[in-house]
UniProtKB/Swiss-Prot annotation:
This is Large ribosomal subunit protein bL17. GO terms for biological process: translation. The gene is rplQ. HAMAP family: Ribosomal_bL17. InterPro entries: Ribosomal_bL17, Ribosomal_bL17_CS, Ribosomal_bL17_sf.
Amino acid sequence: MRHGKVHRKFNRTWEHRKAMFSNLAGALITHEQIVTTLPKAKDLRPVVEKLVTLARRGDLHARRQAIAELKDVTIVKKLFDVLAPRYKERPGGYTRIIKAGFRYGDNTAMAVIEFVDRDVDAKGAADHARTAAAAEAEAA
């Protein structure tokens, strides 16, 4: 019997699920808004909430734990330097899930998962150029 089992399996092994949520969390932190299936968005939310709470702590051990989870130092840098100060006063609830209709190919429910007070100008390559220019101006 499957009583008390909280998370979905997504027809993947444990290692594949862990890697999938690590990649989805990294994409969400990078872009601050992603479109994915509704079940993945619902299971991604606690992963990202825990990472932001970890970043709010801000110590070296928390940073190393985040690197172990996300596997990318640049994403962890954004998490600790941009998102943690933004949500310093918020006691949880850093993300929202908005239903986004159904996918054409297989009619699965889609959803947008985003940060609550996200930067609406953070979009793709233009955002990388914008943040790089801002960092360069700050350094000069």
